[in-house]
């Protein structure tokens, strides 16, 4: 492919609003163009990368027994209203009306649609298990699109769905998809971690997330040097209950004027923050019910993990109580809250690390006052102990090793959805005993377009992009130093033809530009191997440069293909 025939609008400077390396380099290298905030055009180079990623995905999906289909991006809102997600998605959902005032959405995902199709198409267990997938654009009305294509309003995804007649079928499909995802990311050349994750608005109980470590990642991964890895919302520590040691002292109420935080209360009482019992109040939203107040207790130096609390309660949404709410239910404002004397309609949850603690300090539900020497059972009761805290770096993970933190970009997610959607839409089959049973579902997704950002973040340098060979837009970039010199152009065309005949994808820079411009653009574009045809063209000698390492070597044109094959194999390892 001649570079003069390609649309590659390289730039010397990055956009002023570009915050991260991948955004800067993909714009500068002419891969993407911003049409609007959060809306991007994928120019020819980027689209070539996407097509290669798609091909790897299709090959691995075929191996896993999944079949490709294509669902509409424009979806009737009725399906989403039926599932309850029309409201649950909130402002992130693109909503529109047709000319007859019927409600539609632009699909961010397709559980409702595919379940309704399978409901009408499959009626017997004999047609199951079945796994379908698609590669399609999704839409999400992001409040703050950022980081280029990493978080946009339109993005391409692989989304797959499995349907089984029993749990064994779901487990098998889930495991096959998990293996396929690992194969996909391995082939692409990404560094990634498979982590335990929360299912969020997708529903279901079991899920794994595939995350690519990167400084700009919006997820925090808690991991060890062993096998343990989880996102911060799901991460746990190795916990051993402690027995109560010492005697319970007399409950005493003390004035703590101006103490509105744990640290201020600790200073006022002459205690450590860990000796303060922190009381956080939430309102839990359950389907068809009024908001229910929930108090969560934990050590003053710990943080409440709202995802864990919501998961334990099984609520649709967990809201932080306002000052008005806390005054309504507890008669006090934040900073003076505690579990002693609360109304019976307030559910009290306590983090498991509080077990065994005695003579704690806590809010008295009276502004400006705290209790000291408060104890479980004697002074107040809790409805349930559990893991409701956010882990801290350095703590011991379940595998016995210290927890480390790193940021990560979510690149894939797989869920065991169970029967939630099939029950909502009546997607049932007759089982072996002739009974109607709901199909058991799994859901699987890869952010195809955001993979470009993840790959770029892990591989780019100060000079430009550095693509792994498996997904690079071209295998080789041939650069005649001076396009005006016939011997250089003739040699460049000759080796390009030979390399293409050998099966390589070659970009040849036939532009009448200065050598410095060509080399700078080549570094920006990031093709794995650069072949420079220069002053030694008359001798049949060219220079090979490995983009990843910067190493160079001179070879005779007759040995070029052999050397490139060796180098590409080495760079792929």
UniProtKB/Swiss-Prot annotation:
Catalytic reactions of this protein: tRNA(Pro) + L-proline + ATP = L-prolyl-tRNA(Pro) + AMP + diphosphate
Domain of life: Bacteria
EC main group: ligase
CDD domains, per the entry: ProRS-INS (cd04334), ProRS_anticodon_short (cd00861), ProRS_core_prok (cd00779)
PROSITE patterns: AA_TRNA_LIGASE_II (PS50862)
EC number(s) on file: 6.1.1.15
Gene3D superfamilies (alphabetical): Anticodon-binding domain, Bira Bifunctional Protein, Domain 2
Cellular localization per UniProt: Cytoplasm
SUPFAM superfamilies, A to Z: Class II aaRS ABD-related, Class II aaRS and biotin synthetases, YbaK/ProRS associated domain
Disulfide bonds: none
Keywords from the named record: Aminoacyl-tRNA synthetase, ATP-binding, Cytoplasm, Ligase, Nucleotide-binding, Protein biosynthesis
GO biological-process terms attached to the record: prolyl-tRNA aminoacylation
GO molecular function annotation: aminoacyl-tRNA deacylase activity; ATP binding; catalytic activity, acting on a protein; proline-tRNA ligase activity; transferase activity
GO-annotated cellular components: cytosol
Function per UniProt: Catalyzes the attachment of proline to tRNA(Pro) in a two-step reaction: proline is first activated by ATP to form Pro-AMP and then transferred to the acceptor end of tRNA(Pro). As ProRS can inadvertently accommodate and process non-cognate amino acids such as alanine and cysteine, to avoid such errors it has two additional distinct editing activities against alanine. One activity is designated as 'pretransfer' editing and involves the tRNA(Pro)-independent hydrolysis of activated Ala-AMP.
Family: Belongs to the class-II aminoacyl-tRNA synthetase family. ProS type 1 subfamily.
Subunit structure, as described in the record: Homodimer.
Domain comment, as recorded: Consists of three domains: the N-terminal catalytic domain, the editing domain and the C-terminal anticodon-binding domain.
Entry protein name: Proline--tRNA ligase
Organism: Limosilactobacillus fermentum (strain NBRC 3956 / LMG 18251)
Lineage of producing organism: Bacteria, Bacillati, Bacillota, Bacilli, Lactobacillales
């Amino acid at each position: 492919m001649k570079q003069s025939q390609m649309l590659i609008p390289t730039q010397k400077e990055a956009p002023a609003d570009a915050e991260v390396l991948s955004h800067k380099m993909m714009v500068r290298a002419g891969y993407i163009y911003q049409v609007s905030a959060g809306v991007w055009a994928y120019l020819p180079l980027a689209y070539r990368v996407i097509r290669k990623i798609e091909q790897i995905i299709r090959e691995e999906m075929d191996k896993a027994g999944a079949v490709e289909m294509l669902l509409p991006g424009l979806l009737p809102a009725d399906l989403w209203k039926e599932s309850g997600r029309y409201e649950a998605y909130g402002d992130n959902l693109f909503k529109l009306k047709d000319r007859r005032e019927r409600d539609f959405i632009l699909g961010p995902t397709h559980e409702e649609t595919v379940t309704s199709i399978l409901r009408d198409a499959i009626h017997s267990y004999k047609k199951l298990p079945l796994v379908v997938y698609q590669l399609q654009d999704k839409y999400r009305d992001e409040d703050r699109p950022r980081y280029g294509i990493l978080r946009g309003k339109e993005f391409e995804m692989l989304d797959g769905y499995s349907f089984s007649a029993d749990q064994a079928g779901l487990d098998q499909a889930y495991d096959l998809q998990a293996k396929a995802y690992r194969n996909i990311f391995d082939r692409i050349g990404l560094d990634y971690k498979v982590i335990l994750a929360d299912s969020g608005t997708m529903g279901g109980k079991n899920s794994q997330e595939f995350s690519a470590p990167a400084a700009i990642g919006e997820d925090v991964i808690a991991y060890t040097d062993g096998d343990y890895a989880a996102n911060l919302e799901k991460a746990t520590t190795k916990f051993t209950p402690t027995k109560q040691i010492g005697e319970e002292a007399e409950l005493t109420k003390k004035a703590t004027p101006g103490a509105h935080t744990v640290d201020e209360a600790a200073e006022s009482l002459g205690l450590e923050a860990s000796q303060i019992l922190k009381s956080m109040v939430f309102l839990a939203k359950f389907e068809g019910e009024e908001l229910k107040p929930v108090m969560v207790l934990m050590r003053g130096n710990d943080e409440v993990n709202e995802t864990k609390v919501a998961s334990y309660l099984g609520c649709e949404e967990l809201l932080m109580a306002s000052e008005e709410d806390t005054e309504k239910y507890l008669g006090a404002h934040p900073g003076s809250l505690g579990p002693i004397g609360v109304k019976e309609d307030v559910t009290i949850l306590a983090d498991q690390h509080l077990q065994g603690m005695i003579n704690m300090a806590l809010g008295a539900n009276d502004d400006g006052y705290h209790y000291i020497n408060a104890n479980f059972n004697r002074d107040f009761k809790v409805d349930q102990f559990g893991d409701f805290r956010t882990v801290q770096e350095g703590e011991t993970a379940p595998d016995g090793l210290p927890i480390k933190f790193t940021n990560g970009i979510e690149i894939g997610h797989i869920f065991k959805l169970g029967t939630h959607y099939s029950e909502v839409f009546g997607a049932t089959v007759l089982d072996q005993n002739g009974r109607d049973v709901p199909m058991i579902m799994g859901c699987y997704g890869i952010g195809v377009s955001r993979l470009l950002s993840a790959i770029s973040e892990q591989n780019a340098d100060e000079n430009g992009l550095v693509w792994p060979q498996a997904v690079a837009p071209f295998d080789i970039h041939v650069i005649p130093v001076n396009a005006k010199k016939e011997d250089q152009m003739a040699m460049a065309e000759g080796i390009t033809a030979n390399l293409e005949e050998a099966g390589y994808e070659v970009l040849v820079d036939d532009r009448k530009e200065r050598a410095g411009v060509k080399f700078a653009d080549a570094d920006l574009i990031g093709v794995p191997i650069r072949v420079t045809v220069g002053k030694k063209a008359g001798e049949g000698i060219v220079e090979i440069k490995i983009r990843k390492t910067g190493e160079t070597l001179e070879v005779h044109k007759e040995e070029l293909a052999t050397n490139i094959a060796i180098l590409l194999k080495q760079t792929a390892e």
